[in-house]
Regions:
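Catalytic metal-binding/acid-base residues of hydrolase active sites
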Residues: 228, 488, 530-532, 597, ...
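Short glycine-/acidic-enriched loop or helix-start segments at secondary-structure transitions
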Residues: 438, 492-494, 534-537, 603, ...
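Short, basic, glycine/proline-bearing loop/turn elements
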Residues: 196, 276, 493-501, 619, ...
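Amide-donor transfer/coupling interface in amidating biosynthetic enzymes
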Residues: 466, 470-473, 514-515, 547-687
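Short, well-ordered, mixed-charge alpha-helical segments that flank or form enzyme active sites
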Residues: 34-36, 230-232, 253, 532-536, ...
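Cysteine-nucleophile active-site neighborhood
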Residues: 484, 488-576
Length: 687
């Protein structure tokens, strides 16, 4: 990253960068002379005038000849079940969950909608929604972003494809609860190599005209964007590509989840009129946008989805998946209506009919999607939908472990601190690769503690030694040490967290850890990467730093052999730990997870000992509250579904789930109780 600073601020900037463990080097000076000069080894290798740079190169001219648009409507052949199965199996529609779960969707503790919603986490969202990031305060403002593009339409008519890409992206925002008034756009374009062919040049021209027409019709502008004209390899050309991204801001309370909520509700279609060019009439479309927003904000509509590539059929199927609900289409709804394009239209779940809307069917609880006597099971559709990319992006592996028992240990008494504190100090070390320090500090601050984020500098041996000395001094003043999550050293080979453990094994730091736990009655916690460090140090389950061996428990690679990011349900198996003092055994809490190495492994004998001593704190459970080995509920294949364990006295707590990522208004499309109150419990421990 290049940063321009005033000359008098350079030294201060370098100092600040060093404090963040970043290398900063002055590389250039801004001068009054209008020339760009670059030197290498004392020799000027570039010396260009500013006037030349401003010219943008030599002027060029080309003739562009857009071709006549071809019909692009979806052709529906065959029966209802046949078309639905083919739809679920289509690469453009099938599940991408195995890919999406490889990316951390909850970092920053601001995710309003998870990528997949419903209790099954299977209904994909149509817009990304995140709270605006604020470090030390809270907000109910959020940003929304959605995209639109159909390559099959753009191939037939780049003009229509670009126009409808804009409509699709904006409609997805409206379906998610946003208001149209403050929507803006940005575009990404990608076309074949153009050369001097007039027809080839006609494709980007037609697409840009379509996008421009959509902007003028809607009265909204595109800001920025990126384009490329290199989409040709030998005789292969990419289809004309203009992807529209729509973005806006709104309040969290207005955000609507997409999945169907309950059986018996009606589903209606509200759609705009289309003009002679087979595009939505602008006045009609804007009226539809206003009506949909009004229905969502009044609570009359419980869920909403705008049909895209797969039409109404795709929307209904995906809305059903989230909560395992079925659907029965109304008589008189043709297959062309069900499977055809419906850009700018909206499906809404309502309890009563809506004036001007077409009732297309009702939600059922029979696990089927049916139309006039022909039906197909939701399970069959889900199988086709998820199996298509299973060999590439795995998500449904089977477990060889039997379902474990639910452990239960009710604490009779708990450890107490040697010194009370109304506002305990929390030391949060930040190692290379740590990425949860802000979320952790905020959770601690909200609970009433005083967090200190301490960046470990490893840019040289001297910097590491200095960090060790300063960290040991900071530990003397702290009551809690909290090791946050992340990917220490990029999740180093042969196990993550090795640098963290090496740091804590330093004699000075090790001595302060012993003093904190043995003499001052302090607390420690590690989440995700921090839990991995606690395990490797022996702090869990043994309560002290030891030389671990093969008999010790460990955390290893997820059985699915990839990163997992989703919401899981965890059951309190023991409330012995001061961190869990506000919970009851049997309570179930939902929590985000994001890790590639979270599989807890230990011998049967050790697990029995931990259970008997109340050191198994939390377990992964299914929708019925039972400990499970099923990959849907136990994301890493942990033995006995163990998610978190403690030291013998409970004062050191390690867990995989990111409980620090809880805040009001998050994860609205995945039901559950997310407030485990572990940070409040830790603060109360010292009072």
């Amino acid at each position: 990253m290049a940063v321009v600073v005033a000359p008098e601020d350079v030294d201060r900037f370098l100092t600040l960068a060093d404090s963040e463990n970043l290398q900063a080097v002055p590389v250039a000076v801004v001068k009054a002379e209008p020339r760009l000069v670059m030197n290498w080894n004392g020799k000027a290798i570039v010396d260009i005038s500013r006037e030349f740079l401003n010219s943008n190169g030599a002027e060029k001219h080309i003739t562009a000849a857009p071709e006549k648009p071809q019909p692009y409507g979806r052709q529906v052949n065959g029966g209802f079940a046949e078309n639905y199965t083919a739809l679920a199996d289509d690469l453009n529609i099938c599940s991408k969950r195995g890919l999406a779960e490889q990316f951390d969707s909850t970092i920053g503790a601001g995710t309003v909608l998870m990528p997949f919603g419903g209790r099954n986490q299977l209904t994909p969202i149509q817009a990304m929604v995140q709270k605006i990031s604020v470090e030390k305060r809270h907000t109910d403002d959020c940003s929304l972003m959605a995209w639109g593009y159909n390559p099959f339409i753009s191939e037939k008519s780049p003009y229509h494809g670009a126009y409808l890409a804009v409509i699709e992206s904006v409609s997805k925002l409206i379906a998610t609860g946003a208001e149209f008034s403050d929507v803006y756009l940005t575009f990404q374009e990608y076309f074949e190599r153009l050369g001097k062919d007039e027809k080839r040049w006609g494709k980007p021209l037609a697409a840009l005209l379509g996008a421009f027409k959509a902007q003028t019709d809607l009265g909204i502008a595109a800001i920025g964007g990126k384009d490329s004209m290199s989409g040709t390899f030998e005789k292969l050309d990419v289809p004309p590509t203009l992807v529209s991204f729509a973005v806006t801001t709104d309040k969290v309370k207005n955000v609507t989840a997409n999945e169907f909520k309950k059986a018996g509700d009606k589903v209606v279609l509200i759609a705009p009129e289309y003009n002679k060019n087979d595009l939505p009439d602008t006045a009609s479309l804007l009226a539809v946008y206003g009506k949909v927003t009004s229905l969502l904000r009044s609570g009359k509509a419980l869920a909403c989805y705008t049909p895209t590539y797969g039409g109404i059929a795709e929307a209904v199927m995906k809305m059903c998946f989230g909560n395992s609900l079925g659907f029965k289409f109304s008589d008189g709804i043709s297959l062309d209506t069900i499977f055809g394009y419906r850009y700018g239209g909206f499906l809404l779940e309502v309890t009563e009919g809506i004036e001007g809307a077409v009732e297309i069917g009702k939600i059922t609880n029979d696990g089927k999607i049916s139309d006039r006597g022909e039906e197909i099971s939701l399970g069959r559709l889900l199988g086709a939908y998820e199996d298509k990319l299973e060999s590439v992006f795995r998500c449904n592996i089977s477990s060889t472990q039997p379902d474990p028992e639910n452990f239960s240990y009710i604490a009779q008494d708990r450890a107490a601190p040697a010194v009370r504190s109304a506002k305990p100090r929390v030391l949060i070390p930040v190692f290379p690769g740590t990425n949860c320090e802000y979320d952790s500090a905020k959770a601690m601050r909200d609970a009433g503690a005083e967090p200190e984020i301490f960046v470990i500098n490893n840019r040289s041996a001297d910097k590491v030694a200095e960090s060790v000395e300063r960290f040991a001094e900071s530990m003397k003043k702290a009551q809690i040490v909290f090791i946050p999550g992340g990917f220490s050293g990029g999740d180093e080979p042969d196990g993550s967290g090795k640098f963290i453990t090496a740091f804590f094994r330093n004699a000075a730091v090790k001595a302060e850890v012993a003093d904190l736990l043995d003499n001052r009655g302090g607390l420690m916690c590690g989440i995700c990467n921090g839990f991995q460090a606690l395990i490797k140090l022996g702090l869990v389950p043994y309560g002290r730093i030891i030389d671990t061996d093969e008999s010790c428990p460990t955390l290893t690679y997820n059985t699915i052999a990839r990163h997992q990011s989703k919401i899981v349900r965890t059951r309190i198996a023991s409330n012995k730990s001061p961190w869990l003092a506000e919970t009851e055994v049997g309570d179930i809490y939902s929590v985000p997870i994001s890790h590639g190495e979270g599989r807890f492994i230990a011998s049967d004998e050790l697990i029995r000992q931990l259970a008997a001593n109340g050191q198994i704190a939390t377990q992964y459970v299914d929708l019925d509250g039972n400990a499970s080995s099923d990959i849907r509920f136990n994301p890493n294949g942990s033995f006995c579904a163990i998610e978190g364990i403690t030291s013998p006295d409970g004062r050191v707590f390690g867990k995989m789930g990111h409980s620090e990522r809880y805040a009001c208004g998050l994860y609205k499309n995945v039901p559950g109780d997310y407030n485990i109150k572990m940070f409040e419990s830790a603060v109360k421990y010292f009072k």
